[in-house]
């Protein structure tokens, strides 16, 4: 879902590195490996020169001074913002409700993605030696990266369902904190299960014994059938369409419920406060889903194009690496926005922020509030 392909190979190119003539265990020289690559043209293994796969990497290295600071900025902003959001929700018992628990689950997924997956993936994209973190992490990082996307999707869906229940059935007892914890655990387990097919086809190939100073960690799906395309379509629906659909259905259902149960006449102050509070919470949900959808749209479209065009007729190999990095950077930036959206719509979070930034001033305000409450 959020993968950057460093070593772009058409499906047929995998034969070059996995057959008996060119395996990591052989003592084949670099020249022999190059001849094997050149020979693939005459054998009809690919419609273009397999050495073209390295052209995009050369172009990508030119943009390295631009992309690395941007990625560092994303990691710092998302790391600090989501850590602060988690600290606010976990430290204040008044914030322990269903919506905030699901928001903390969303923040935990974004934090995990930005602090673990993004640095390793970016290092792989820009390191001329390829994957430098060993075989276990080669399989684990793509799994976590894909799973965190599903965690975000399912958490946003859970928030949408919770908002509908609160508005449409206000007298119904809300789910407990322990119940929310169980749902959050289920979200993580389901996300790992949905991400598993991708990790099953990850291959770790060390080409250094063959005279090529490169370690490859990539997806290689079977040649026969359309498993990769089917999984991409499933991922597009499950990780992109579901949150948009859930929020749309929730919004329509809430609108119908409010019109159905609205009481004629001037609403009381308590009703106005209740309506305003619910409107703010739903605005938070809509803003989060829109930010997620807009950030992930370029990468979703690009991944679908690559699956439909494995021979790179639509997008040339020279530009595909740079395009992947651009789309990946925009997608990863989605982890930065939720803390700001939540803080702008939640007064208690803003109070916590003031407390962290100006602790002395916060203590004075607390003393004034206590004095006024005693009087």
Please provide the spans of the model-predicted regions.
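Cytoplasm-facing ends of alpha-helical transmembrane segments in multi-pass membrane proteins
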Residues: 79-90, 107, 111-119, 147-170, ...
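Helix-to-loop junction signature of class
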Residues: 71-74, 112-128, 142, 149-156, ...
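Extracellular N-terminal segment of 7TM GPCRs
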Residues: 1-80
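Intracellular effector-coupling site of seven-transmembrane GPCRs
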Residues: 212-225, 236-239, 256-299
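Seventh transmembrane helix
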Residues: 247, 289-304, 322-375
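Loop architecture of class A 7-transmembrane GPCRs
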Residues: 48-57, 125-147, 169, 175, ...
């Amino acid at each position: 879902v959020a993968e950057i392909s460093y070593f772009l190979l058409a499906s047929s190119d995998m034969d070059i590195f996995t057959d008996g003539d060119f395996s990591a265990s052989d003592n084949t020289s670099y020249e022999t490996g190059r001849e094997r690559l050149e020979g693939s043209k005459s054998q009809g293994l690919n419609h273009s020169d397999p050495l073209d796969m390295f052209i995009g990497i050369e172009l990508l290295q030119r943009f390295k001074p631009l992309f690395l600071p941007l990625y560092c900025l994303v990691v710092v902003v998302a790391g600090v913002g989501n850590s602060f959001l988690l600290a606010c929700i976990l430290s204040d018992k008044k914030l322990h409700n269903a919506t905030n628990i699901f928001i903390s689950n969303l923040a935990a997924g974004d934090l995990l993605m930005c602090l673990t997956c993004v640095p390793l993936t970016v290092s792989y994209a820009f390191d001329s030696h390829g994957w430098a973190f060993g075989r276990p992490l080669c399989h684990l990082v793509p799994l976590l990266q894909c799973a965190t996307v599903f965690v975000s999707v399912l958490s946003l869906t859970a928030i949408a369902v919770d908002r509908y229940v609160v508005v449409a059935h206000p007298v119904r007892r809300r789910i407990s904190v322990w119940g929310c914890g169980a749902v959050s655990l289920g979200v993580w387990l389901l996300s790992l299960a949905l991400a598993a097919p991708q990790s099953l086809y990850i291959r770790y190939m060390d080409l250094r014994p063959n005279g090529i100073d490169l370690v490859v960690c990539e997806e290689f799906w079977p040649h026969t059938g359309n498993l990769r395309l089917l999984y991409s379509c499933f991922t597009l629906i499950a990780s992109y369409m579901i949150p948009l659909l859930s929020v749309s259905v929730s919004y329509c259902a809430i609108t119908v419920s409010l019109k159905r149960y609205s009481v004629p006449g001037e609403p009381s102050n308590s009703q106005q406060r209740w309506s305003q509070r619910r409107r703010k919470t739903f605005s938070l949900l809509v803003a989060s889903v829109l930010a997620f959808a807009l950030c992930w749209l370029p990468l979703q479209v690009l991944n679908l194009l690559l699956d439909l065009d494995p021979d790179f007729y639509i997008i040339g190999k020279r530009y595909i690496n740079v395009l992947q990095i651009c789309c990946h950077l925009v997608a990863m930036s989605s982890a930065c926005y939720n803390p700001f959206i939540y803080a702008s719509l939640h007064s208690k979070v803003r109070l916590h922020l003031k407390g962290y930034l100006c602790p002395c001033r916060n203590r004075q305000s607390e003393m004034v509030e206590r004095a006024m409450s005693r009087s």
